[in-house]
Amino acid sequence: MNFSKSLLLIAFGGAIGSIFRYLLQYWFGNVLGYSLPWGTLTANLLGSFLIGVVYAISDRFPLFDPQWKFLLASGFCGGFTTFSTFSYETFQMLKSGHYILFLGYICLSVVGGIGFAFAGVWMIKNF
């Protein structure tokens, strides 16, 4: 595959994923408030599920065009999920003295992300 084409697919997918994450964070912030970063958590969990789906489809169907992986996994999921925002929000919880929220958010994000990725793979492999 052409390297330049791969970069364009990743950039396009990343731009779309970033826009979706922003809209999700904006919506959750307006509906539920900002006491817990629901938008970031939801984006990271959904992105983990989607990347599991993409890689499972790629494994299950050998003719799956690798370009889709660049667009969807590296691009969309890479732009949609955000470890840096998760890290900053977690740091802010710690700095503000919200220790239980801090630990809960870390556990929910990490264990939930792995669980959602597993669920995405499991769903494709079993249906």
UniProtKB/Swiss-Prot annotation:
> What name has this protein been given in UniProt?
Fluoride-specific ion channel FluC
Indicate how the chain sits in the lipid bilayer: Multi-pass membrane protein
Q: Which GO terms describe its cellular component?
A: plasma membrane
- Which PANTHER family does this UniProt record tie to the protein? FLUORIDE EXPORT PROTEIN 1-RELATED
Q: Which GO terms describe its molecular function?
A: fluoride channel activity; metal ion binding
The entry assigns this protein to a family as follows: Belongs to the fluoride channel Fluc/FEX (TC 1.A.43) family.
- Catalysis performed (reactions): fluoride(in) = fluoride(out)
Q: Which Pfam families match?
A: CRCB
Q: How is its activity regulated?
A: Na(+) is not transported, but it plays an essential structural role and its presence is essential for fluoride channel function.
Q: Which organism is it from?
A: Leptospira interrogans serogroup Icterohaemorrhagiae serovar copenhageni (strain Fiocruz L1-130)
Q: Where does Na(+) bind?
A: 78, 81
Name the source's superkingdom. Answer: Bacteria
Q: Where in or outside the cell is it found?
A: Cell inner membrane
What's an example Gene Ontology biological process for this entry? cellular detoxification of fluoride
Q: Principal localization? A: membrane
Reply yes or no: does the keyword Nucleotidyltransferase apply.
no
Report TM segments. Answer: 8-28, 37-57, 68-88, 100-120
Which keywords does this Swiss-Prot/TrEMBL entry list?
Cell inner membrane, Cell membrane, Ion channel, Ion transport, Membrane, Metal-binding, Sodium, Transmembrane, Transmembrane helix, Transport
Q: What does this protein do?
A: Fluoride-specific ion channel. Important for reducing fluoride concentration in the cell, thus reducing its toxicity.
